[in-house]
């Protein structure tokens, strides 16, 4: 199993998923931890099996959740593109104000199992 953690998008030295997965054995599972769920297609193109992201807080406050839903292909929850699976957690934390209105915080337990060949 490969577990890849990516630098934040604000880091100018952030490597592409293609760079991070180059040379890995594609027969082994590739898991990516990427704070922001931008450009989900990159994980699919890089042969990533599962990506876990957060960052969005699902908008945290209504009506910002409507805007966040438009900003991201998936602002929260499970998603699949081709063979790549994604989960974007709305998290338990907050940003700015100490409240959430119209969105749910969450913690996620993910069970991983072997591939069915």
Language-model regions: role of each:
Residues 1-117:
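Soluble catalytic domains of enzymes that build or remodel membrane lipids, polysaccharides, and related
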